[in-house]
């Protein structure tokens, strides 16, 4: 495992804080000194840096999709002249574009669907122009599509679409190359709904290499962070914090791309022994409840079990579902574990 150093100065309750992470790390301090704030920002940094290229691509993809969605109102307005199959084909193509990610086809697949959508628009527009008799309506639609003359439909649509895609692609390539720290700040604010502002003095090093510089460094040995908060603040059913909804998702759902960790069965056996039971799934109408089943036969919903049990239960599920691996930073913000020394990890 790589060695990490994380520092924040003069941010809310934090005056000066330095932590080194190499294996198990315990952060100790008085109540209100900023331990949770420190942990939260470490979570933000790791989870944003580790998928930065995916963020760049999703922003690129979303701009392309929005450029096509703006025509939907016009297509509805001129629906009397549209072939229903062509309109459905266009909508289906947009739906497929929303599912394109950096890892399942990237730019090449997005370009393919984009050209298909543009071709569909071209066909529908030509069909409309052949039948529409109102010159004002014709001009209105042509203006929306950026077409100068009615007899230049194919040329203008092709030129405009190529130009837009090229400009967006260039911006995407520039972001990948430059990796601006301003982008990291914007993503943390939007994705995690963080309203307190980015710390003025913050540092994150992997093996003594600073990653939070003007051109963001790439994180090598971690691919995600998981945050287990104070039990009283956690509800697997409802939460307004992204950290908690992310945890809830991982506790409930299997990671289809997850990998086995060394000693998985031994870990699971050890945790089951500590909690003197296991976690089972029980159907509850259209949902699934996670239930603690004790070795003496009692069933208790996870939400209702003792606070000291919860971190272990969540760890158990994270391991079972394939989310907790050797490349995961697990943060447990759990004061009550101090009441149970045998459960401290």
Place the predicted regions along the sequence by residue.
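Phosphate-coordinating catalytic segments in nucleotide- and nucleic-acid-processing enzymes
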Residues: 5-7, 48-327
């Amino acid at each position: 495992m790589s060695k990490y150093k994380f520092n924040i100065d003069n941010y809310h309750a934090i005056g000066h804080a330095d932590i080194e992470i190499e294996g198990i790390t315990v952060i100790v301090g008085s109540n209100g000194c900023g331990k949770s704030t420190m942990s939260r920002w470490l979570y933000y940094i790791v989870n944003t840096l580790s998928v930065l290229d995916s963020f760049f691509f999703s922003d690129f993809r979303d701009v392309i999709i929005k450029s096509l969605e703006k025509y939907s109102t016009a297509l509805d307005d001129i629906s009397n002249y549209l072939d229903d199959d062509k309109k459905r084909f266009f909508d289906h193509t947009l739906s497929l574009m929303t599912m394109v990610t950096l890892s399942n086809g990237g730019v090449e697949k997005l370009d393919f669907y984009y050209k298909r959508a543009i071709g569909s628009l071209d066909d529908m527009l030509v069909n409309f122009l052949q039948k529409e008799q109102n010159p004002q309506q014709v001009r209105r639609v042509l203006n929306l599509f950026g077409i100068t003359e009615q007899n230049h439909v194919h040329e203008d649509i092709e030129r405009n679409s190529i130009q837009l895609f090229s400009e967006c692609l260039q911006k995407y390539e520039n972001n990948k190359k430059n990796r601006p720290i301003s982008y990291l700040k914007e993503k943390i604010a939007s994705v995690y709904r963080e309203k307190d502002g980015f710390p003025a003095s913050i540092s994150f090093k992997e093996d003594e290499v600073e990653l939070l510089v003007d051109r963001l460094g790439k994180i090598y040995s971690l691919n995600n962070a998981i945050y287990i908060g104070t039990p009283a603040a956690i509800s697997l059913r409802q939460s307004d914090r992204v950290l908690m909804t992310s945890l809830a998702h991982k506790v409930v759902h299997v990671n289809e791309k997850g990998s086995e960790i060394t000693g998985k069965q031994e870990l699971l056996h050890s945790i089951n022994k500590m909690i003197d039971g296991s976690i089972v799934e029980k159907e509850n109408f259209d949902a699934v409840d996670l239930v603690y089943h004790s070795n003496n036969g009692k069933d208790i919903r996870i939400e209702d079990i003792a606070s000291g049990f919860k971190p272990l239960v969540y760890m158990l599920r994270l391991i079972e579902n394939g989310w907790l691996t050797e490349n995961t930073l697990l943060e447990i913000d759990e004061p009550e574990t101090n009441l149970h020394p045998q459960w401290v990890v």
